[in-house]
Amino acid sequence: MKEPDAIKLFVGQIPRHLEEKDLKPIFEQFGRIFELTVIKDKYTGLHKGCAFLTYCARDSALKAQSALHEQKTLPGMNRPIQVKPADSESRGEDRKLFVGMLGKQQTDEDVRKMFEPFGTIDECTVLRGPDGTSKGCAFVKFQTHAEAQAAINTLHSSRTLPGASSSLVVKFADTEKERGLRRMQQVATQLGMFSPIALQFGAYSAYTQALMQQQAALVAAHSAYLSPMATMAAVQMQHMAAINANGLIATPITPSSGTSTPPAIAATPVSAIPAALGVNGYSPVPTQPTGQPAPDALYPNGVHPYPAQSPAAPVDPLQQAYAGMQHYTAYPAAYSLVAPAFPQPPALVAQQPPPPPQQQQQQQQQQQQREGPDGCNIFIYHLPQEFTDSEILQMFVPFGHVISAKVFVDRATNQSKCFGFVSFDNPASAQAAIQAMNGFQIGMKRLKVQLKRPKDANRPY
């Protein structure tokens, strides 16, 4: 029969050919087993190399953890076996306390004596710096959750110890997941990922607007060629940022209101509205009196805008509905299901002659400048599969001026290889990014951030 305070253990680093009957002899020596289940994929049924283990008695679980966890390596494995309380168990059976506002002169023994009246202590450690000086805090682990809770109820804020600036702090220590979540929140705060409503006022307003414009340009650069609606979203984001920057009421751009003018714009002189409503950083394409675009104009994604028609020519209703939105009408092929009669203007790339050698050399120099000086380029490993250039750019912008940010993609599958690089313009920013982000956990991934090797060294990939 299982005891009420029995612990459910997670067992990792198990050879995939071992089943429950093979594992029982390893664990039975520590006590009677209530349940042992090998974890398998629910779709394929394949062994995942781990298991859940529950003893009838709590002491048996503690003995097994003490004797086996990272102490023994099973045949065929490169790393020692992992035996620890399962996540679901550790949340309900928290026994580890954080103790803050201790005096600098207090030792492990002093802290132990303070907490011994509440139960049996498994661990007691005062945190110290590299020079051995106490940091004024400690971790204390009891054998049971009830003992830890009793210590909190009695000692928290109950006294102020000599040398401390405020009353004693006693609380449950953060779990690994909570620490990871807090670090993500701190980085999100640095990146300006706040509520847009809360940031329409105050000191962060300008920063939010700049981020919106930056994100809009990135969205357009990386996804507009896939969908015209992505371009629409980018224009919308820049529109909102530009209007907010002038203290106006932002009116969303909607495809169904092409013939009307947003009230905020109609009530404002044209000169008061920023021109940064283009895609990929370009302003709307200028037209000549003939209605045709200037021959040397730059077009987003290398595609001609739909040319304006003369008054005598028949006006397509869809084009009329989107009058003035050249970036949206730059994708006539996307409307083939709605308006098959749309002409297909040739791409700008096909019309332009090859650039002269001098321009080609300048382009090569610009490409080389995308990498920073030695000591300013960092590699990031273990990126989440869904991360793109824009995500790592936003992640590392707080540490300094970013020259380039790139996620490596498999050309055959177009899937991320889960690593990339970021180039800063100075070594100090690179070092700050490494110190802050190396080991940072995103979901189940823990980032590895390090300096890029010199060009004459073997590349890590």
Curated annotation (Swiss-Prot):
Show the SMART domains listed in the entry: RRM
Q: Which InterPro entries match?
A: CELF3/4/5/6_RRM1, Nucleotide-bd_a/b_plait_sf, RBD_domain_sf, RRM_dom
Coiled coil regions, renumbered to chain: none
What Gene Ontology terms describe what this protein does at the molecular function level?
mRNA binding
Cellular compartments annotated: Nucleus; Cytoplasm
Q: Where is the composition biased (Low complexity)?
A: 359-369
Bias category Pro residues: which stretches?
345-358
Query: Has keyword Nucleus?
Result: yes
Q: What does this protein do?
A: RNA-binding protein involved in the regulation of pre-mRNA alternative splicing. Mediates exon inclusion and/or exclusion in pre-mRNA that are subject to tissue-specific and developmentally regulated alternative splicing. Specifically activates exon 5 inclusion of cardiac isoforms of TNNT2 during heart remodeling at the juvenile to adult transition. Activates the splicing of MAPT/Tau exon 10. Binds to muscle-specific splicing enhancer (MSE) intronic sites flanking the alternative exon 5 of TNNT2 pre-mRNA.
Indicate what this protein is called per its UniProt record.
CUGBP Elav-like family member 3
